[in-house]
Each structure stands twice: as structure tokens, then as C-alpha cells.
A protein has these predicted regions:
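Aromatic-lined substrate-binding rim segments of carbohydrate-active enzymes
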Residues: 62-155, 219-243, 306-313, 338-346
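Short, solvent-exposed turn/loop segments enriched in Gly/Ser/Thr/Pro and often Arg
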Residues: 52-55, 90-98, 136-145, 208-211, ...
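N-terminal carbohydrate-binding accessory modules
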Residues: 4-109, 124-132, 182, 231-234, ...
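Active-site groove signature of glycoside hydrolases
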Residues: 92-96, 134-217
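The substrate-binding groove and active-site-proximal loops of carbohydrate-active enzymes
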Residues: 57-71, 100-117, 161-177, 205-220, ...
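Aromatic- and acidic-residue-enriched segments that line the glycan-binding/catalytic groove
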Residues: 102-114, 128, 138-171, 175, ...
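Extracellular glycoside hydrolase catalytic/binding regions
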Residues: 179-190, 204, 208-352, 361, ...
Length: 392
């Protein structure tokens, strides 16, 4: 990695609006899809890098409930950092099915206005800075409730034990997902005054974050569920791009010749990227990259993983995007890895969008080994900024 030059002096101030950081272009229209290409204003290719900020809704719900300006400032800080780093896309959770006081939903019909207002403000804070959002509507994991919360609601309803994998065969659980999507589509944001279905700040909706189904005995059930939910989402959110939100696991190992480990592509997790990419109901298909977690630590694995996902989607007229990528290690090592990964992504046909995991405000404690503090991790910040500037 090259020696990072100083970032703008204004970068160390809280507000990009009052600093010397050049602003991002204002959001004035929807991002769409051509034949395997993201398009802005119907004709200009859209290329960008960004980050995951999954926690925005929760922090802003807390800030509103407590009248806590420090929490609101922490959100402002990290979003201003995106502006200064020229990162115009963030991926944030659009769900919160936990029992926490920041919850959006505590039961099938128990929606929480306080939680929804947290999401409202997250959209507004991003919009006024020119940051577009990718928003999953559920979670495979128990964090923020997720499919385990759906299973718990169903267990309480029927008096039997359900697991998250039952979501893929239970019509009522899937209807609960649809109920939330429909509610959100028609909701008028209390900060922007715009219905969610009409909000161009939303780049794409994801069906869910990292769906898996180890007990599904094949990948058909998960694929069919994504098809059903994506079709519904397209009806209620007709202006937006629709994506799956998955990790890119597949059941067609022959499409990924050269990987050092077949685990992510032999169907063990019940998902098939290639089948999802073929769904007409989806505009975009996501894949994630965590080399250690996926057992892909050979030097060649990165290129194969990224290039093959992009090629599969492009051949089917879809947009593939790197929805998450994370590295555990020193700042300089992470910077070199991100630089190499983004290099592979943006050099291939169809490579248009890559998001790292995860950027945190300086006051928030890290909850995993992948966290990046842009004001401390200067090598990583510089690499992200360089890519952001180059893609503008």
C-alpha cells in the first residue's frame, strides 16, 4: 500500500457541511438497471464504493427517545466521514424485530412508531448528504430479531417450536414479512415528507440479509422464497431496484473452478447464487467476502470469488455487487486487502458496486474484529477515499 497522504484538514471536524470536504452530488433521481448495468438518470453508468452502517436506525431511535445529542452527533460524524471519503453508498438495516426499545416491530402486528422514526431519520440524514442506501428488510441471524424472531412469534401462535429455517415453508411467516414491506412502502417519512416507495435515496431493497437454510435439503426452497418475496416487493416498491441480500453461496461448484475450498459453492447452506441470479424478479444479486470465515484464504481465491460472481450475473443481465467484505488484521494489512479486492471488482465487466464492513463512529465500541474507525485507521481510510474519488 502506498504511504497515505494527509486527508483533508476538514476531515477531522464533525460536520462536512461546515468543512472543506467537497459535498457529494445531491440525490435527484432513482438508480436503475440496464442490461446488467446500474444506470443513473437512465443512461449514465453508476459506479461507487461504500460501507455498511447497519446500526443507524437503532442509534437514532435511542437519540430521539433520550433527547441525546451525542448519539445524533455520532451518526452525523460517520455520515460526514462518508462524504469526506467520497463514499456515496451505505447499507443499513431497515428492520428491527428485537424486544429492544429501539424496535420497529415486537410482534406480527405490533409496530413501533418510535423505531420507525429512527429509520425515518436515518434516511433523511443520508439524503441530505447525498448518500444512497441499500436496505435489507429482514435478517437471517438473531441480531435485531431476524428470522429467529419470526420463528418465536410463530411458536407462540401455535404452541410448537419453530426455527428460522421454517420461514421458508411457513406461509404465515412470509406474510408477516410482506406486511412490513407493504407498511413501509406507504409510510410517509416524518423527516422528509416522502413515501418510502417514492424515495430516490433508496438505491435498492434487499429481501433479507444473508439468508441460509441448512435444513432445506437443496436450494429450491430458499430460491422460491426469494422469488415470492421479491415479486411482492416489486409490486409495492415499483421505483426501486430489488436484490436478494445474500452471501453469494452456490450449489454449482463447477462455476467456480480454482477456489481452494468448495464449502461456499457445494450447497451446504441451502443457497444458490446462480439460481437467484436467474430470477426475473431480481435486479441485483449480492455476494459477500470474508476470506477466513468462508475458508477462502488462498491468494487466488479473491479473484475467482469476485470474477465468477460478476460473470454469472452479467451473463444473465443482472447486476452483481459486493454487499459486504471484511478483513481481520492490522490497519495496513486491511488497507492492502481492500485495495486488492476493489481492484478485482472494478476491473471486471459488470463490477460497479462494493461495500466494506464496517465503518464506525469514534464513540461507538467495536462489536466485531472487522470494524474500521476512519479517523484512527488512516491507511484504510486513505484507500477507501482514493477509490471513492476515482469512481466519482
Amino acid at each position: 500500500v502506498e504511504t497515505p497522504p494527509p486527508l483533508p484538514a476538514a476531515y477531522d471536524e464533525l460536520s462536512a457541511a461546515s468543512s472543506g470536504c467537497p459535498p457529494l452530488p445531491p440525490i435527484s433521481g432513482f438508480v436503475g438497471r440496464g442490461d446488467g448495468v446500474l444506470l443513473y438518470d437512465a443512461f449514465a453508468p453508476y459506479r461507487a464504493t461504500g460501507t455498511n452502517l447497519y446500526y443507524l436506525q437503532q442509534l437514532l431511535a435511542y437519540a430521539q427517545q433520550d433527547g441525546n445529542p451525542r448519539l445524533a452527533a455520532a451518526v452525523g460524524e460517520v455520515l460526514d466521514d462518508l462524504v469526506c471519503l467520497s463514499l456515496p453508498v451505505a447499507r443499513i438495516w431497515g428492520f428491527n424485530d428485537s424486544p429492544d426499545r429501539s424496535s420497529i416491530r415486537k410482534g406480527p402486528d405490533d409496530f413501533q412508531e418510535a423505531g420507525l422514526r429512527g429509520l425515518d431519520q436515518a434516511v433523511w440524514e443520508a439524503k441530505r448528504r447525498g448518500i444512497r442506501l441499500i436496505v435489507p428488510l429482514a435478517n437471517n441471524w438473531a441480531d435485531y430479531g431476524g428470522l429467529p424472531a419470526y420463528a418465536a412469534w410463530a411458536s407462540k401462535r401455535d404452541g410448537v417450536v419453530y426455527t428460522r429455517d421454517d420461514f421458508f415453508s411457513d406461509a404465515t411467516m412470509k406474510q408477516w414479512w410482506k406486511d412490513y414491506a407493504a407498511l413501509l412502502a406507504e409510510r410517509v417519512n416524518t423527516f422528509t415528507g416522502v413515501r418510502y416507495r417514492d424515495e430516490p435515496t433508496i438505491l435498492a431493497w434487499e429481501v433479507a440479509n444473508e439468508l441460509r437454510c441448512q435444513t432445506c435439503r437443496g436450494t429450491t426452497r430458499l430460491t422460491d422464497t426469494v422469488r415470492e418475496l421479491a415479486a411482492f416487493l416489486r409490486r409495492v416498491m415499483p421505483n426501486h431496484l430489488i436484490a436478494d441480500g445474500g452471501e453469494g453461496f452456490d450449489d454449482q461448484a463447477g462455476l467456480y473452478v480454482g477456489l481452494s475450498n468448495s464449502y461456499p459453492v457445494r450447497g451446504d447452506e441451502g443457497t444458490s447464487f446462480s439460481a437467484l441470479a436467474a430470477l426475473p424478479e431480481l435486479d441485483m444479486v449480492s455476494y459477500h467476502y470474508y476470506p477466513k470465515s468462508y475458508g477462502l484464504e488462498s491468494p487466488r481465491d479473491t479473484a475467482v470469488w469476485i470474477q465468477r460472481h460478476q460473470a454469472i450475473a452479467t451473463a444473465l443481465g443482472k447486476v452483481a455487487y459486493l454487499g459486504e467484505c471484511g478483513y481481520i488484521g492490522a490497519d495496513s494489512e486491511r488497507a492492502a486487502s481492500f485495495d486488492a479486492w476493489l481492484g478485482h471488482l472494478f476491473e471486471v465487466e459488470g463490477g460497479q458496486l462494493g461495500l466494506m464492513w464496517q465503518l464506525l463512529p469514534s464513540a461507538r465500541a467495536s462489536n466485531d474484529a472487522f470494524s474500521v474507525y476512519s479517523r484512527k485507521d488512516r491507511a484504510t481510510a486513505w484507500i477507501l477515499s482514493r477509490w471513492g474519488r476515482d469512481l466519482r
